[in-house]
């Protein structure tokens, strides 16, 4: 499971998820990507489930990049505990994902295999996603 090695503070505020993703909105490493269309918290377990679904379908061929990291702790109080008396204990880790963020990238497989692998991965995630391709930036090398 993905989680930070160490953190300065054990608990964090929930924060707001307004606007679109600032960075990581294009496919940089691979040829194909899975882009989020809504904002949500994605847990380390959901990221791992999506990764396993992709790699199993690709029969361990190709390469997968995970471009989100669960660095935010979320807390929960035990069951049947009265309100108050402090914030709960850390329960797990989440990655904050905003619309436009490319979460996974794939290369080394055909487009049909990549499309199906990313579709299977998207079913493991709590956000609507879309399949995106890498866009080549710039023109020919011969142009002046």
From Swiss-Prot:
One of its GO terms (cellular component) is cytosolic large ribosomal subunit. It comes from the Bacteria. CDD domains: Ribosomal_L16_L10e. One of its GO terms (biological process) is translation. GO terms for molecular function: rRNA binding; structural constituent of ribosome; tRNA binding. SUPFAM superfamilies: Ribosomal protein L16p/L10e. The keyword Ribosomal protein applies. Keywords: Ribonucleoprotein, Ribosomal protein, RNA-binding, rRNA-binding, tRNA-binding. Binds 23S rRNA and is also seen to make contacts with the A and possibly P site tRNAs. NCBIfam families: rplP_bact (TIGR01164). Part of the 50S ribosomal subunit. Belongs to the universal ribosomal protein uL16 family. This is Large ribosomal subunit protein uL16. It comes from Halalkalibacterium halodurans (strain ATCC BAA-125 / DSM 18197 / FERM 7344 / JCM 9153 / C-125). The lineage of its organism: Bacteria, Bacillati, Bacillota, Bacilli, Bacillales.
């Amino acid at each position: 499971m993905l989680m930070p090695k160490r953190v300065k503070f054990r608990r964090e505020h929930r924060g707001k998820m307004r606007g679109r993703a600032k960075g990581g909105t294009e496919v940089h490493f691979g040829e194909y990507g899975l882009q989020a269309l809504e904002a949500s918290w994605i847990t380390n377990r959901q990221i791992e489930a999506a990764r396993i679904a992709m790699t199993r379908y690709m029969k361990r061929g190709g390469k997968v990049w995970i471009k989100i990291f669960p660095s935010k702790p979320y807390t929960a109080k035990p069951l049947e505990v009265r309100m108050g008396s402090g914030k709960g204990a850390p329960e797990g880790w989440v990655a904050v994902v905003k619309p436009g963020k490319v979460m996974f990238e794939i290369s080394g497989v055909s487009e049909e295999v990549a499309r199906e692998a990313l579709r299977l991965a998207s079913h493991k995630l709590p956000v609507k996603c879309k399949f995106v391709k890498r866009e080549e930036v710039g023109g020919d090398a011969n142009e002046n």
